[in-house]
């Protein structure tokens, strides 16, 4: 039977991609349905109880700048907050927080259940309704049919998921959850390229069986960082430390002597695992010269005894896992409460997607998260927000939107996936962005909130706070520019006490702030330049904008030069055999990838600068030289 009411957008899956997609589509006023096999696992952290990190924290800030959920949820659930790379430049500084799994899940569910235009329904999806190469609905396991103008797949590791512990394996979406086999079969019938990937998770340890007294502690930062531009540290729950132990030669001997029982090394697992989050058996074999590896013992929550040993993801048999755990300092008597495992699952080639993450072959069908070959909650959430936005726009007969590489890490992520594809789980790093000085955590709102407002993602409260911050930045910069001190002034001695070289000429507040030894905090304690802004976010922006003004201006020039051709559109129906002068290899690659723009085409391996020049000349001759807005 058909459900009596139609929807604008259906989201299939309630993980980090699905929840952001559902919230985004509903925020934009579209009638949205979130289908999940279990309402109690909405926002579940299937692996590491943490949000953020290098590159990942940048994505979380961007999701927040566009009105998303993840940053707000972790501010309510984070039990240890740190700034990584704090001693380095602002481009690579990143926020990371340990999470209480239960509090995080509660924060996500509360937000979903209080979001207007959003309905949540508990049923697994087994089929899609496709008519004339357009998706028009979904069918659940009990045969209930839902109609919609757009359908979003955010199914994580559930598509034909297979869990491995040693040489034993069984079907599962993750530990304790069933796989989605009928939907996997249905998707394989569609004209989509499919592959298999693998990820893994470590065993969980009973904290009561660990001797923490012999281990080093790792505390969070004070003052505590905040993820959301709308948040403050008073929202954080109780803060707790993590602990550090190490593997040793005994650990490594146990692993080496049991490799024949590893499904990875025995050839049982075919899927490729994440390069930057390898299993402990992989680390021991790949880095044979290392006699130890650092392991972080991370609490899973304030009311839980479970510890997540970050660094020993494994699919070795349970008896070997016990030996590995008990070989490490402080864990000689440790007990495992959940075994580690690896999971293989289907993913679909993201090169078959438009930059909006809509399928090139099935109109109205969108993909986000691990189904696109990514790994990580943050990567999933960012894609989820983008597909929710674009599914909503499609259902309202509006053009889709995707950020450029120069606008956001989300733009880098989507461009990498849609242009290059991936053969292993894709993780975001700051090194993937060529314009990372412009794409900092601290300015995510300055880059994206105005766009989010235009798209309908940003509410009145966030918009008012954003404009207040802009005004504070502008007012303070003008004040510092127009406040001067001379070498002969009474205040010169006070100023010179904070400088490595005394004043030799008149200097403004901005001139002084450009000096390496001067900070905004110091500057605004000096009589001529007091008081400091009470808006800490605005104060941070003032300091960064002044200190890095020259570098930022140079990078902006680079972006403008690159954008002249980057946004030149390529017709989706163009047969590149029509373009004389291109090599057969280039023609084959362009016809295979069908890039949306010159920028995308230039990043395809084997497409040379000469080929790009030929393309531009041909487009001009044909009167087809058009640039996107």
UniProtKB/Swiss-Prot annotation:
GO biological process, alphabetically ordered: tRNA methylation; tRNA wobble uridine modification
Domain of life according to the entry: Bacteria
Binding site for FAD: 13-18, 125, 180, 370
One GO cellular component term noted in the UniProt record for this chain: cytosol
Keywords: Cytoplasm, FAD, Flavoprotein, NAD, tRNA processing
Gene3D superfamilies given in the database record: FAD/NAD(P)-binding domain (3.50.50.60), GidA associated domain, C-terminal subdomain (1.10.150.570), tRNA uridine 5-carboxymethylaminomethyl modification enzyme MnmG/GidA (1.10.10.1800)
GO molecular function: flavin adenine dinucleotide binding
Required cofactor names: FAD
Localization (cell): Cytoplasm
Pfam families: GIDA (PF01134), GIDA_C_1st (PF21680), SAM_GIDA_C (PF13932)
Subunit structure: Homodimer. Heterotetramer of two MnmE and two MnmG subunits.
Family, per entry: Belongs to the MnmG family.
Protein name: tRNA uridine 5-carboxymethylaminomethyl modification enzyme MnmG
């Amino acid at each position: 039977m058909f459900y009596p009411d139609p929807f604008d957008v259906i989201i299939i899956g309630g993980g980090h991609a699905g929840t952001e997609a559902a919230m985004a589509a509903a925020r934009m006023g579209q009638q949205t349905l979130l289908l999940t096999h279990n309402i109690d696992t909405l926002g579940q952290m299937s692996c590491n109880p943490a949000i953020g990190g290098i590159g990942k924290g940048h994505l979380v800030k961007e999701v927040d700048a566009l009105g998303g959920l993840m940053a707000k949820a972790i501010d309510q659930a984070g039990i240890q907050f740190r700034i990584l790379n704090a001693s380095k430049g602002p481009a690579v500084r990143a926020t990371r927080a340990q999470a209480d799994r239960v509090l995080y899940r509660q924060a996500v569910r509360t937000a979903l259940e209080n979001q207007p235009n959003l309905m949540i329904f508990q049923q697994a999806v087994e089929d899609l309704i496709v008519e004339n190469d357009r998706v028009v609905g979904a069918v659940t396991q009990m045969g209930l049919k839902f109609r919609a103008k757009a359908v979003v797949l955010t199914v994580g590791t559930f598509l034909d998921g297979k869990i491995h512990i040693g040489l034993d394996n069984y079907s599962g979406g993750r530990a304790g959850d069933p796989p989605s086999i009928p939907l996997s079969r249905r998707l394989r019938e569609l004209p989509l390229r499919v592959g298999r990937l693998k990820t893994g998770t470590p065993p969980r340890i009973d904290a009561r069986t660990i001797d923490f007294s012999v281990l080093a502690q790792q505390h969070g930062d004070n003052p505590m960082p905040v993820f959301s531009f709308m948040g403050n540290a008073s929202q954080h729950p109780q803060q707790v430390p993590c602990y550090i132990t190490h593997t040793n030669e005994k650990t490594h001997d146990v692993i080496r002597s049991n490799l024949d029982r590893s499904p990875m090394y025995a050839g049982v697992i075919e899927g490729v695992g994440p390069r930057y989050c390898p299993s402990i058996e992989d680390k021991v074999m790949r880095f044979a010269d290392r006699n130890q590896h650092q392991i972080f013992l991370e609490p899973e929550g304030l009311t839980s005894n479970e510890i997540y040993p970050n660094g020993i993801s494994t699919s070795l048999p349970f008896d070997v896992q016990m030996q590995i755990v008990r070989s490490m300092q402080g864990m000689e008597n440790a007990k495992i409460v959940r075994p580690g495992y690896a999971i293989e699952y289907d993913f679909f080639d993201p090169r078959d997607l438009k930059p909006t993450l809509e399928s090139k072959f099935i109109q109205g069908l969108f993909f986000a998260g691990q189904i696109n070959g990514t790994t990580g909650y943050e990567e999933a959430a960012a894609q989820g927000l983008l597909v929710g936005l674009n599914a909503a726009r499609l259902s309202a007969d509006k053009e889709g939107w995707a950020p450029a590489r120069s606008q956001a890490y989300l733009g880098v992520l989507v461009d990498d996936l849609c242009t290059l594809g991936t053969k292993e789980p894709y993780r975001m790093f700051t090194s993937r962005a060529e314009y990372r000085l412009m794409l900092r955590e601290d300015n995510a709102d300055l880059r994206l909130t105005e766009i989010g407002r235009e798209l309908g993602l940003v509410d009145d409260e966030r918009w008012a706070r954003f404009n207040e911050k802009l005004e504070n930045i502008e007012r303070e910069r003008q004040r510092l520019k127009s406040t001067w001190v001379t070498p002969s002034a009474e205040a010169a001695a006070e100023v010179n006490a904070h400088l490595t070289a005394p004043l030799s000429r008149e200097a403004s507040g901005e001139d002084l702030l450009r000096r390496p030894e001067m900070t905004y905090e110091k500057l605004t304690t000096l009589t001529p330049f007091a008081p400091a802004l009470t808006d800490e976010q605005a104060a941070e922006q003032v300091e960064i904008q002044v200190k890095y003004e020259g570098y930022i201006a140079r990078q902006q020039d680079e972006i403008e030069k690159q954008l002249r051709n980057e946004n030149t559109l390529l017709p989706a129906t163009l047969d590149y055999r029509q373009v004389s002068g291109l090599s057969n290899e280039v023609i084959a690659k362009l016809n295979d990838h069908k890039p949306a723009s010159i920028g995308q085409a230039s990043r395809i391996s084997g497409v040379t600068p000469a080929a790009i020049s030929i393309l531009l000349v041909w487009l001009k001759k044909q009167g087809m030289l058009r640039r996107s807005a």
